[in-house]
Amino acid sequence: MKEYDKYLKLLKEKYPTKQSVYRELINLNAIMNLPKGTEHFMSDLHGEYDVFYHIINNCSGVIREKVAMLYGDELTVYEQQELCTLIYYPREKLSILMDENKVNDEWYRNVLNQLIQIAKLLSSKYTRSKVRKAMPVDFAYIIDELIHAQKDEDDNRSVYHRQIMETILSLHNGDEFLVALTDLIKRLAVDHLHILGDINDRGAHADKILDLLMEHHSVDIQWGNHDILWMGAFCGNPVCMALVVRNNIKYKTMSILENGYGISLRFLLQFAVNTYSDKNVDDAVYKAISVILFKLEGQLIKRHPEYRMEGRLLLDKMNLDKGTVRIGDKDYFLNTNEFPTVDMNNPYELTMEEMFLMGRFRADFINSMALERHINFLYDKGSIYKIHNGNLLFHGCVPLDEQGVFDGIVVDCKSYSGREYLDYCESMVRQARTGDSDAVDFMWFLWSNILSPVTGRCIKTFERTFLDKDRNADYKKAIEEDKNPYYVQYENERICKMILREFNLYNENAHIINGHTPVRTKEGQHPVRAGGKLIVIDGGFCEGYHAATGIAGYTLIYNSHGMKIKEHHPFMSINMAINSNRDIESESQVVYVEKQRVFVKDTDNGKQIAEEINDLMNLLKVYNS
């Protein structure tokens, strides 16, 4: 009670009079009765910057819907498309329209008024104060005046607003004002953005995506396995470093390492060419880093018998005379028997050259200022899971056993499973940032283990790299990666409800929102599962998955009316979007409709505001006593 009295005393400093308390209570109660803001969910971006940038700009079709709502009967389809493109890419589209001699004062008047009406529509669910804060500073006063215009008896306001517009045009400031309006529209269209992991992977520009996310007004991230891999590399895990380098070599995205983060591949290239006989330099480099990786993995596995990953120790199972490797109780043909740096008497020991290479990589990773900025952002905005407005968000899984019971690990004689296990994993990720050696090693466990909540499968990198696909009859079975039973059990509504209860979510509209596993739409898979309790939104942004999924990604929109999922078709290019007004074609499917519209008072933010109201009411009692 004494602590609360101290709190009220501090609160009194902020609200020194009864009238100031009344004013804030009126304001907070008004906010509680506004519609909840729109939430936008995206997952598995995989470094695909262009498609991500476009979907961020079009807000998964929200802006196109608002344009159609306002101007469906007034503008042609082409004119609506052009207006949308102008909102998505204002400077680029303006330049093209100017080259086509379409831009004049009359054009500015029409378009600016259209943009003002769109901004007015989108701002209607927010307080005027919040809208004002969202406005570009240079035009905040002017935009505030124009979008809150009200007709008066003598039409004085209309004359006033027309004069504002004419002054903007006479000063040749129309371009900047237009850009400011489009920025506001995009900001108001989505109140909060959720990224369900895997910003990184095979795409070339995860760094540009992170730069864009760092500019976003309201975002959270649920870490994916690829995010954890990069975080582990920056924290000093050599296995994670080798994996990051290997992945970027495999997908030919080395520019993100060298140009994005200043991580040099020059010494690896020299070493590979001098050590391996492959005629193709890329093959030699890939083999060199792969061998280093498996040596480092072996060292880590031996340091941590509690991981129970001895089955991944395969270098010592090779018979180079026969060109085979024993996995389990079977011998498989290797696609090469050239392992000049592997001493079969001590196969997991790095050579001096390999140690030198890893020393260089370590220095580059931990000293990269650009990477540090991005990793700090991932730590600041990220978590293993998030509970938000009655939904449970995570990238991978909540590990289960075959019977659908929560599974996990034992650490220091203590068993962790369910929510407690996910909390433990997050604490280890955060400890890794401090340099704790066990926590740093644990980052690789999270990348590779079937019990990892961000991965949930047994990663078979060695098999996919060194088994001969032509000479091994059961090659496909050998490289098949076992998945955590979660990925079968999550089709069951009872299991999903059990998971939701584990996180204290009992509402009938509570959902698990999940990424990580591409939804194979062309095979009949559906993103909404388990009686509507589970929504999987990894539809494959990455072009490499399009053939398997049949689409180009899913996103999810949750507004005050309910939830709808967006199924996206492949995106051509930003240039085509700008030049030909080609938006991403998307189909919408309603997940559910709220029985009653959701207001701020029904959200997590509403609960916080309710506590503030309660505190202010108690402060009022102090003033009245």
Please name every model-derived segment.
Residues 1-625:
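Feature recognizes metal-dependent phosphohydrolase scaffolds
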